[in-house]
Curated annotation (Swiss-Prot):
The keyword Repressor does not apply. Keywords: Plasmid, Toxin-antitoxin system. Disulfide bonds: none annotated. Antitoxin component of a type II toxin-antitoxin (TA) system. Neutralizes the toxic effect of cognate zeta toxin. Part of a postsegregational killing (PSK) system involved in the killing of plasmid-free cells. Continuous synthesis of the epsilon antitoxin is required to counteract the zeta toxin. This is Antitoxin epsilon. SUPFAM superfamilies: Plasmid maintenance system epsilon/zeta, antidote epsilon subunit. Belongs to the epsilon antitoxin family. Pfam families: Epsilon_antitox. It comes from Streptococcus pyogenes.
Length: 90
């Protein structure tokens, strides 16, 4: 599969966004001293899901698939902000 400028640009944007989302959740887990092995905690499950999602090789995807991956990370960005902000309010 050929790598184009558009595809490389999309991958770079996804990498930046995914790192931001993952680091937000990781910082929350670490700052609140949550047990990273406790699968009963929503934040820990979210962290593990994001870790798995970050491991995919984006260069194997088509541009259309990358756009879907980008939307996934946008959704996870919004969701993680909602979940972590609710914890602060509660």
């Amino acid at each position: 599969m050929a790598v184009t400028y558009e595809k490389t640009f999309e991958i770079e944007i996804i990498n930046e966004l995914s790192a931001s989302v993952y680091n937000r959740v990781l910082n929350y887990v670490l700052n609140h001293e949550l047990n990273k092995n406790d699968s009963q905690l929503l934040e820990v499950n979210l962290l593990n899901q994001l870790k798995l999602a970050k491991r995919v090789n984006l260069f194997d995807y088509s541009l259309e698939e990358l756009q879907a991956v980008h939307e996934y990370w946008r959704s996870m960005n919004r969701y993680s902000k909602q979940v972590l902000n609710k914890e602060k309010v509660a």
